[in-house]
């Protein structure tokens, strides 16, 4: 028998509904409120009193009024999973919003699920090869790890994300799920069409809950994307999960918390901040079947890294990739800052002695070059010692060799994209450090793949 309640109060996205005291819906159950020509889905958040629940709407509450009937579905919000979701664009409820026709999925998963148990998890640290030199060499990603992507507007976050999607699809046969959490609809729209043009859409599922949507949708959309990823992982796939932006997940939680009447914590955030973040992040992990590797764009409010939202996120990250405007000004792409980016995987026991030594030497030489830049600016390069001149020469070559042509940017750059295996990356930088290529002009190193490509370019320049 259906369990019906009546709407008794509506305050923005918060709805109070009265049920029979014997049949109160469980927490996190989905409710359907019949608003005439449409059904509004809400999620139970609190039990208040003997016979009343407080729910948060996942959709706009326009048109709702007191006295309307609400049906308890008896389960939490469930979203479609499986191969059918690839190439499509969904909202928080798993409904397609791309206008590409009807969607039928054989299977669906609830968005609230437990994290894998300790027995199921894979504990062996394993490198996730991206084929992008600067990442693989200096701040390698962990399979099943969580990576924070930091960068302002227009420094290439989206292109880097697209290249990662392209590389995992073509080189590893893996799939990607992109989750837009509380970001601009225009950016989501641009991303969708750019993915379509660059040919990576067929290997990707997109889930959007943008900044014009109610806080309930923005708070739960990350779970929708994660649930789709978990299905692929359980089928033995390596999945890339992109969350743009993880700060908006916290921000939406803060709005909901205030609306539910909870006493705020530090800086006005929800008292359950660490718990909510943990519940999401703990589900992102490798199991013995497959892995979910997550790349999360992190907005830092007022550039304050001690703000509770980014500070809570940092506790979960295994690696950080920092994109820098000063590097884009040099015309070097991807504009990853080699000295600011870091990774827990940069450990000789995981990546091996050779890779570790080369990475540390590259960082040292770039650090020394940064120190010398002030002297060069004031006195000129001729005033440096012979040893420092050598350091500057090699550092400039390394800086340019850290650039790379991307497959997804081919139509804009006219250069064929390059995927570089880690072994080739390490070998190339080792040879530069050893001085084997001191006689090659630094311009030959810009936008090349392997060191062989550099040598070919140098030969062409001589001709």
From Swiss-Prot:
Residues bound to ATP are: 151-158
Kindly report the protein's main subcellular placement as a broad class.
membrane
Keywords, A to Z?
ATP synthesis, ATP-binding, Cell membrane, CF(1), Hydrogen ion transport, Ion transport, Membrane, Nucleotide-binding, Translocase, Transport
Where does it reside? Cell membrane
> What membrane topology does the annotation report for this chain?
Peripheral membrane protein
Q: Which Pfam families match?
A: ATP-synt_ab (PF00006), ATP-synt_ab_N (PF02874), ATP-synt_VA_C (PF22919)
Enzyme category, top tier: translocase
Q: Under the GO molecular function aspect, what terms does this record hold?
A: ATP binding; ATP hydrolysis activity; proton-transporting ATP synthase activity, rotational mechanism
Cellular component, GO annotation: plasma membrane; proton-transporting ATP synthase complex
- Entry keyword Hydrolase: no
Matches recorded under SMART domains:
AAA
Looking up SUPFAM superfamilies in the UniProt record yields: C-terminal domain of alpha and beta subunits of F1 ATP synthase (SSF47917), N-terminal domain of alpha and beta subunits of F1 ATP synthase (SSF50615), P-loop containing nucleoside triphosphate hydrolases (SSF52540)
In terms of superkingdom, the source organism counts as: Bacteria
Q: Is S-adenosyl-L-methionine tagged as a keyword?
A: no
Give each disulfide bond as a residue pair.
none
- Catalytic reactions on record: ATP + H2O + 4 H(+)(in) = ADP + phosphate + 5 H(+)(out)
Q: State the EC number(s).
A: 7.1.2.2
Q: What family name appears in the similarity comment?
A: Belongs to the ATPase alpha/beta chains family.
Mind telling me which PANTHER family this protein's record contains? ATP SYNTHASE (PTHR15184), ATP SYNTHASE SUBUNIT BETA, MITOCHONDRIAL (PTHR15184:SF71)
Report quaternary structure and partners: F-type ATPases have 2 components, CF(1) - the catalytic core - and CF(0) - the membrane proton channel. CF(1) has five subunits: alpha(3), beta(3), gamma(1), delta(1), epsilon(1). CF(0) has three main subunits: a(1), b(2) and c(9-12). The alpha and beta chains form an alternating ring which encloses part of the gamma chain. CF(1) is attached to CF(0) by a central stalk formed by the gamma and epsilon chains, while a peripheral stalk is formed by the delta and b chains.
Q: What does this protein do?
A: Produces ATP from ADP in the presence of a proton gradient across the membrane. The catalytic sites are hosted primarily by the beta subunits.
Q: What is this protein called?
A: ATP synthase subunit beta
What species was this sequence derived from? Clostridium botulinum (strain Loch Maree / Type A3)
Gene name?
Answer: atpD
């Amino acid at each position: 028998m259906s369990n019906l309640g009546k709407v008794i109060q509506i305050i923005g996205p918060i709805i109070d509904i009265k049920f029979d005291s014997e049949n109160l819906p469980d927490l996190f159950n989905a409710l359907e409120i019949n608003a005439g020509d449409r059904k509004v889905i809400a999620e139970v958040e609190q039990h208040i009193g003997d016979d009343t629940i407080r729910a948060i709407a996942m959709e706009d509450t326009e048109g709702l009024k007191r006295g309307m009937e609400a049906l308890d579905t008896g389960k939490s919000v469930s979203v479609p999973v499986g191969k059918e979701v690839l190439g499509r664009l969904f909202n928080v409820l798993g409904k397609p919003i791309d206008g590409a026709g009807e969607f039928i999925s054989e299977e669906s998963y609830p968005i609230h699920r437990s994290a894998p148990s300790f027995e199921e998890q894979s504990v062996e640290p394993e490198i996730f090869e991206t084929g992008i030199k600067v990442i693989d060499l200096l701040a390698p990603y962990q399979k099943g790890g969580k990576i924070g992507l930091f960068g302002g507007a227009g420094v290439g976050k989206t292109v880097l994300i697209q290249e990662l999607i392209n590389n995992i699809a073509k080189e590893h046969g893996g799939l990607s799920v992109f989750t837009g959490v509380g970001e601009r609809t225009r950016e989501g729209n641009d991303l969708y069409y750019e993915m379509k043009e660059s040919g990576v859409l067929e290997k990707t599922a997109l889930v959007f809950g943008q900044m014009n949507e109610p806080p309930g949708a923005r708070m739960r959309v990350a779970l929708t994307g994660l649930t789709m990823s978990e299905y692929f992982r359980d089928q033995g796939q390596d999945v890339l999960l992109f969350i743009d932006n993880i700060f908006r997940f916290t921000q939406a939680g803060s709005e909901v918390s205030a609306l539910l009447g909870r006493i705020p914590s530090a800086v006005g955030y929800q008292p359950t901040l660490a718990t909510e973040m943990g519940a999401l992040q703990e589900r992102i992990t490798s199991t013995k079947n497959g892995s979910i590797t997550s790349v999360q764009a992190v907005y830092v409010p007022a550039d304050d890294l001690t703000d509770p939202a980014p500070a809570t996120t940092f506790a979960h990250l295994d690696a950080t990739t920092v994109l820098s405007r000063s590097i884009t000004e040099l015309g070097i792409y991807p504009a990853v800052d080699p000295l600011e980016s870091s990774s827990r995987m940069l450990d000789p026991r995981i990546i091996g002695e050779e890779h570790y030594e080369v990475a540390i030497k590259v960082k040292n030489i770039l650090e020394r070059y940064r120190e010398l830049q002030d002297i060069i600016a004031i006195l000129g390069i001729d005033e440096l010692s012979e040893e420092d001149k050598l350091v500057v020469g090699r550092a400039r070559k390394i800086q340019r060799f850290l650039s790379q042509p991307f497959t997804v940017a081919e139509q804009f750059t006219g250069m064929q994209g390059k995927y570089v295996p880690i072994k080739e990356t390490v070998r190339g930088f080792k040879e530069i450090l050893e001085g084997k290529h001191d006689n090659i002009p630094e311009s030959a190193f810009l936008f090349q793949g392997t060191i062989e490509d550099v040598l070919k370019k140098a030969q062409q320049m001589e001709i």
